[in-house]
Amino acid sequence: MAAETLLSSLLGLLLLGLLLPATLTGGVGSLNLEELSEMRYGIEILPLPVMGGQSQASDVVIVSSKYKQRYECRLPAGAIHFQREREEETPAYQGPGIPELLSPMKDAPCLLKTKDWWTYEFCYGRHIQQYHMEDSEIKGEVLYLGYYQSAFDWDDETAKASKQHRLKRYHSQTYGNGSKCDLNGRPREAEVRFLCDEGAGISGDYIDRVDEPLSCSYVLTIRTPRLCPHPLLRPPPSAAPQAILCHPALQPEEYMAYVQRQADSKQYGDRAIEGRQDPDPPVWSETKPGVVPPKKAGASPAKENSKESDFWKMLHEPEEQPPEKEETQAEEQEPNLEATDPPPTSPDDFQNNVQVKVIRSPADLIRLIEELKGGTRKGKPNTGQEQPGDSATEVPSREPEMKEKGDPEQQNEVEEEEDDEDEDEDEDERQLLGEFEKELEGILLPSDRERLRAEVKAGMERELENIIQETEKELDPDGLKKESERDRAILALTSTLNKLIKRLEEKQSPELMKKHRKRRVVPKKPPPSPQSTEEDPEHRVRVRVTKLRHGGPNQDLTVLEMKRENPQLKQIEGLVKDLLEREGLTAEGKIEIKIVRPGTEGTEEDARWLTDEDTKNLKEIFFNILVQGAEEAQKERQRQKELESNYRRVWGSPGGEGTGDLDEFDF
């Protein structure tokens, strides 16, 4: 698709860059197979643009998307200068050779591998057999896939030139002259490949796979920890993919416009930060306009009412205009000054009479409002005696309040009437529901009822998910600054809702049955089937523990399963349930965990299934699989979403994005 096309073109240019230096110097270009086999690349489409045509470096290539957006992609250093001198830089190995490392396998037991109908037996340095087993006994003919002939010579010059074993990091042996093949009449032959497996134990040799690429020609892959000390066979460190960084390439005028927009947005952000970090509001000053008493003494009542309304409007925006709070406080104190009609005072006396209140929190603002309301109630009778105009203007505003507060009996009567109407409506609804349930019981089968119950439950879960999404949108971004804190809050909310659903399912069902029995006679229903108990939340998580044990030499493995009554199984199930509830996860699908350790002989009853250390480590294993794996998947999804958004953006276009279908992007 689009991303694959872009990546393939980049890799093609990358290979061209590898070949180009050799052709310019007159040499012969060669394809570096070692690089392709051991290096991985990942493309990163970044949102930060660059000015096109400014970089002349050899590691920069120009590509274009399907929307004609040009990119400058910088190839990683490893793509241009791969480790061509790796062989020379390899430290000298002073340990035993590869044949010496594998020689202890001669005295070890033969390795067995069962695949479909056949069982394969490999005896190091001797032969390879194939036969069929039934009831731990060999049935039918034993076929020889080959006898030991030779081993790969690491010191041979021809072997060094092939580099096949060095690249694949395996040692091989050849087995031939086996049983005659019925298909082509030739003797069977096999190649055995030995690979390092650092995770296996001291004697952890095992046959990993058996392939038959050609008729009667076999390839056995054996993994063993014996070869890991050798540097040529030790697996390379798993390196992260080499990133190919691609920046949108803009024309000079587009790039300058982008830089100007960034500068403007930065200045706007700095101003906003400075506004938030302002110190305490400044105190009143005698130079402020509008606070000098002589000019305000002759103000009309209409102006005072407008000032009072402006004060309550400004209280709704306390943080945006902090200096105006003090002005409104001064204006609220002006009625007292006008009532007494004092002569003009000096600035010093004015400052002594001013009360400065600093509002630092919403609680302080509420207290200030209450004080101002109390002050106006106390001051209004005095002002009413000397200024009848004020009382005349304030009476209409008080009348609605008195009407609301003075009729509690009428309000109670209205509430009682509404309650009676609600009860009548509820009774009608109950009757309709009862008739509907009667009809359903006569029509629906028990399976249909279970299905309807499941659909109702699914609908409840969808509603809860919508509530969670709405809660996430309403979360204060300043209160939960870190994404991890927001995720933990959502998980905790999900866990709480799951517990509520569980309690509702446990408590509501018997209560509903009692209500139905009170209203009408219901025929007795048969007891619920065992399947319904398994659908209960208590049985959503089931742990199954099985043990594989050899029945004897050259015999099949016996499978033992832990009984449900085993207390150790109950302990493991409780551990998993607690982890799922705490992290707000649901149990979906199956998870298989294999614990490989030396087995003990004995029956199921006297054998210890899991050691204390195994049980202790299970919690960490579950956490890594369920929780940490989910977080990594979420991060990867977010990264892919950002890459797709960056790819769709077309710089300089009116809409700013391409017109491609979202489904066609698959990085």
Curated annotation (Swiss-Prot):
PTM description: Intramolecular disulfide bonds.
Domain MRH: 108-230
Name under which the protein is recorded: Protein OS-9
Native organism taxonomy: Eukaryota, Metazoa, Chordata, Craniata, Vertebrata
Signal peptide: 1-25
GO BP: any one term: retrograde protein transport, ER to cytosol
Compositionally biased region (Basic residues): 514-523
Cellular component, GO, one term: endoplasmic reticulum lumen
